[in-house]
């Protein structure tokens, strides 16, 4: 659609008397005015000097209506561009935020290792030579040895501090240079924050002085030799882990004291006895003396945090110092602020305005030994030489208080010169072109690196970069376009991306505190893959990243398979956990631990006799085993119970207790009288078979056992049985039935 220009609409009247003017908005307005006054005007062109015609007023009204309809549609072009640009930014903003978050999470707990991928095989620098002598039993000893070396490595070394100087750039130079102070007093304290006890309101703090040094003030680093700098060593005994149960963290407190500029008579420069006014107020004099006299600056750095992690590695540090003023504020609630002319400075401006202390930190095995602590690596740079800088020492500075000082060794400088002189290896220039609605919206600056823009992964090869973008960032569509100096990658939004959940389905049904947690390897659902054919791997080619001719986007259909399949229990509808897959939970409804738990709970009852407890045990185990859950199943449950446990009931003389159990179930309308009759008849038949199978006359021991069982409380049911003489429906005397047993 071609852009429309304002005022480009214009005249064309009707017939040969049409005006020749070009008016656009002016013509429409004139037509409306003419129609309102007399109705003798043409439809257009009169705004630019057109002639009148004999058309009717209806034509003028139609032209006016058409002009009024066109006016609201036309908008300035800038508004369209800005609105379209906002939509473009919103479309790319959400996927970018998602991939940035995933990048940070994968750095902490990676799901997979990039070096194990086929298209990233060049990142795997390990060899398989040691696999011949590998033993599983040696893994534990290696890990323990490695941990022991790390702890002893970080604690058996001396902390050596070499102070370069104290820089105070805002300080005004003294007029009397002979009395100018060239050094300041530096006191280093080791602050130990101990664990808080119950009676303590806050964590107790211990300050251990480690020494004082005279540090040069504003030295010229070009004229000072490195060996002349003062140094201080902190013994490793101060960081012993034996007190780890008491000390929570260790930190260094730097306290710089700068004396005032005074003459030999003890007076401040420019101040004599004649200048002292006796009538001057004492507070004002003290304030002036404090401003021109001694000043104290402090700064604190953490050595070991509460997790025993070393925070200060080898390197050069520059610490921003804060002036400590006399104030009645409690030290527990005091906070430090850098003030300049009543305004708070940003963090990095304090290094150009406020006082700073520069020093070099090293961990050494002995006082004069070489460094043994791990060297701080420089920040990752986005250029092709980042690989050469991985093993070079650098400096790491904590945020807000320590500035980064970039140091390059002579070896690195010579290597850079060599690389610049040798242009045999051509660098690939990669730039990205972002498309929205099939139009180019933004194009990045050409870079000579192969880092992923979203997760900053160094792919090292163009094919690996494109493969990584396609597989790991599938919310976008990447098309490779050849460029003489490198490559152009067109990036567009994947409108067909399936954003449904494709992770572990167990996490959806877990408790909120345990869902999506990855503290270590977990058991997954066992699966079996059947490999019918494994074709030969295709050779890597850049043609697979070219834009398809038919315009169709290659989409991968997502489906739940393998470890992501989820099964449910049929009785409880709860998800089946992976560790339960090996046990057939549908058949085993009464595990051993549940049976023992049921028996133990029944044994704890105190308001029932032993006979009732035995019947309750047998009945509960019977119901658990067969899974009876409905009322209409109770009739069948009673008959099955008699078949399975009838002989045990007869041998233990539990017939009367079982009859009481049946009557109680009838009271709750769980079973019918017919079921009671069938159960009692079945039990009587089993009793007769047992009597025939055994001796006709029972022994004296069996008679005594039966009498004892009746005396132990089995006869307690007689009072209840007499109350149930007859049934309300059938009128059958229940007492006579029980007496037959």
Curated annotation (Swiss-Prot):
InterPro entries: Polycomb_protein_VEFS-Box (IPR019135)
Post-translational modification: Sumoylated, probably by PIAS2.
Pfam families noted in UniProt: VEFS-Box (PF09733), Zn_SUZ12 (PF23320)
Main location: nucleus
Residues found modified as Phosphoserine: 20, 543, 548, 585
Sites of the Glycyl lysine isopeptide (Lys-Gly) (interchain with G-Cter in SUMO) crosslink: 74-75, 77
GO molecular function: chromatin binding; chromatin DNA binding; enzyme activator activity; histone H3K9me2/3 reader activity; histone methyltransferase activity; lncRNA binding; promoter-specific chromatin binding; RNA binding
Region feature (Interaction with AEBP2 and PHF19): 148-365
Annotated segments matching region Interaction with JARID2 and EPOP: 81-108
Residue ranges covered by zinc fingers (C2H2-type): 450-473
Biased amino acid composition, Polar residues: 707-717
Mutant lacking the gene: phenotype: Mice exhibit early embryonic lethality and defects in gastrulation accompanied by reduced methylation of 'Lys-27' of histone H3.
Region (VEFS-box): 565-641
Region described as Disordered: 1-21, 689-741
Covalent cross-link site, Glycyl lysine isopeptide (Lys-Gly) (interchain with G-Cter in SUMO2): 77, 225, 392
UniProt-listed CDD domains: C2_II_SUZ12 (cd21740), VEFS-box_SUZ12 (cd21551), ZnB-Zn_SUZ12 (cd21750)
Tissue: Expressed in embryonic stem cells.
GO biological process: cell population proliferation; chromatin organization; facultative heterochromatin formation; negative regulation of cell differentiation; negative regulation of chemokine production; negative regulation of epithelial cell proliferation; negative regulation of transcription by RNA polymerase II; oligodendrocyte differentiation
Keywords, alphabetical: Chromatin regulator, Chromosome, Isopeptide bond, Metal-binding, Nucleus, Phosphoprotein, Repressor, Transcription, Transcription regulation, Ubl conjugation, Zinc, Zinc-finger
Compartment(s) of residence: Nucleus; Chromosome
Subunit structure and binding partners: Component of the PRC2 complex, which consists of the core subunits EED, EZH1 or EZH2, SUZ12, and RBBP4, and various combinations of accessory subunits including AEBP2, JARID2, PHF19, MTF2 and EPOP. Within the complex, interacts (via C2H2 zinc finger domain) with JARID2 and EPOP; JARID2 and EPOP compete for SUZ12 binding. Also interacts with AEBP2 and PHF19. Forms a monomeric PRC2.2 (class 2) complex consisting of at least SUZ12, RBBP4, AEBP2 and JARID2.
Function description: Polycomb group (PcG) protein. Component of the PRC2/EED-EZH2 complex, which methylates 'Lys-9' (H3K9me) and 'Lys-27' (H3K27me) of histone H3, leading to transcriptional repression of the affected target gene. The PRC2/EED-EZH2 complex may also serve as a recruiting platform for DNA methyltransferases, thereby linking two epigenetic repression systems. Genes repressed by the PRC2/EED-EZH2 complex include HOXA7, HOXB6 and HOXC8.
PANTHER family (UniProt xref): POLYCOMB GROUP PROTEIN, POLYCOMB PROTEIN SUZ12
Family: Belongs to the VEFS (VRN2-EMF2-FIS2-SU(Z)12) family.
Protein name from the UniProt record: Polycomb protein Suz12
Organism field: Mus musculus
Organism phylogeny: Eukaryota, Metazoa, Chordata, Craniata, Vertebrata
């Amino acid at each position: 659609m071609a852009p429309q220009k304002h005022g480009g609409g214009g005249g064309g009247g009707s017939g040969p008397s049409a005006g020749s003017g070009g008016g656009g908005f002016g013509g429409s307005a004139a037509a409306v005015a003419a129609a309102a006054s007399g109705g003798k005007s043409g439809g257009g062109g009169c705004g630019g000097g057109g002639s009148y015609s004999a058309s009717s007023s209806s034509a003028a009204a139609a032209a006016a209506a058409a002009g009024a309809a066109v006016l609201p549609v036309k908008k300035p072009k800038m508004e369209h561009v800005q609105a379209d640009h906002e939509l473009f930014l919103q479309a790319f903003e959400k996927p970018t935020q998602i991939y940035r978050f995933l990048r940070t999470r994968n750095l902490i707990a990676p799901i997979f290792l990039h070096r194990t991928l086929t298209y990233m095989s060049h990142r795997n620098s390990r060899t398989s030579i040691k696999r011949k002598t590998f033993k599983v039993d040696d893994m534990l000893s290696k890990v323990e040895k490695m941990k022991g070396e790390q702890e002893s490595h970080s604690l058996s070394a001396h902390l050596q501090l070499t102070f370069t100087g104290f820089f105070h750039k805002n300080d005004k130079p003294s007029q009397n240079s002979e009395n100018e102070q060239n050094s300041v007093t530096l006191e280093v304290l080791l602050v130990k924050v101990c664990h808080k006890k119950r009676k303590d309101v806050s964590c107790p703090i211990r300050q251990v002085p480690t020494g004082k040094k005279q540090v040069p003030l504003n030295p010229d680093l070009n004229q000072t030799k490195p060996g002349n700098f003062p140094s201080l060593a902190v013994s490793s005994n101060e960081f012993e882990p034996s007190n780890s149960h008491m000390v929570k963290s260790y930190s260094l407190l730097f306290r710089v004291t700068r004396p005032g500029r005074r003459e030999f008579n003890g007076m401040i420069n420019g101040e004599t006895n004649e200048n002292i006014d006796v009538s001057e107020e004492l507070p004002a004099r003290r304030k002036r003396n404090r401003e021109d006299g001694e000043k104290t600056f402090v700064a604190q750095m953490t050595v070991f945090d509460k997790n025993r992690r070393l925070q200060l590695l080898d390197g050069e540090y520059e610490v921003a110092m804060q002036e400590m003023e006399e104030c009645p504020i409690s030290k527990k609630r005091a906070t430090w602020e850098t003030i300049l002319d009543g305004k708070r400075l940003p963090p990095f401006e304090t290094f150009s305005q406020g006082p700073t202390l520069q020093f070099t930190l090293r961990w050494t095995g002995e006082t004069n030994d070489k460094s043994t602590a791990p060297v701080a690596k420089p920040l990752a740079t986005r250029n092709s030489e980042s690989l050469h800088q991985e093993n070079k020492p650098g400096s790491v500075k904590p945020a807000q208080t320590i500035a980064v000082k970039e140091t390059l060794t002579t070896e690195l400088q010579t290597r850079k010169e060599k690389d610049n002189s040798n242009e045999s290896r051509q660098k690939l220039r990669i730039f990205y072109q972002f498309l929205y609605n099939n139009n180019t919206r933004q194009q990045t600056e050409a870079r000579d690196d192969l880092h992923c823009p979203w997760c900053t992964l160094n792919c090292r090869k163009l094919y690996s970069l494109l493969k990584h973008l396609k597989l790991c960032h599938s919310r976008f569509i990447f098309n490779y376009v050849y460029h003489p100096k490198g490559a152009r990658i067109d990036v567009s939004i994947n409108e067909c991306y399936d954003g449904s959940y494709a992770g572990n389905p167990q996490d959806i049904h877990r408790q909120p505190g345990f869902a999506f947690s990855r503290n270590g390897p977990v058991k997954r659902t066992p699966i079996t893959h059947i490999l019918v054919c494994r074709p030969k791997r295709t050779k890597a080619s850049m043609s697979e990243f070219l834009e398809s001719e038919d315009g169709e986007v290659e989409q991968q259909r997502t489906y739940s398979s393998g470890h992501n399949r989820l099964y449910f229990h049929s009785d409880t509808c709860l998800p089946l956990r992976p560790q339960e897959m090996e046990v057939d939970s549908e058949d085993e409804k009464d595990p051993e631990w549940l049976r023992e738990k049921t028996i133990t709970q029944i044994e704890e009852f105190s308001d029932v006799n032993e006979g009732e407890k035995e019947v309750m045990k047998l009945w509960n185990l019977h119901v658990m085993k067969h899974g009876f859950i409905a009322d209409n199943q109770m009739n069948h449950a009673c008959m099955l119970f008699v078949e399975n446990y009838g002989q045990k009931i007869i041998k233990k003389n539990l017939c009367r207790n079982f009859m009481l159990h049946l009557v109680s179930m009838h009271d709750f309308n769980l079973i019918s009288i017919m079921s009671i009759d069938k159960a009692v008849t079945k039990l009587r038949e089993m009793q007769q078979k047992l009597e025939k199978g055994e001796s006709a006359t029972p022994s004296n021991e069996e008679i005594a056992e039966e009498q004892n069982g009746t005396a132990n409380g089995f006869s307690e049911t007689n009072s209840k049985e007499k109350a149930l003489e007859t049934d309300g429906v059938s009128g059958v005397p229940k007492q006579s039935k029980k007496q037959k047993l």
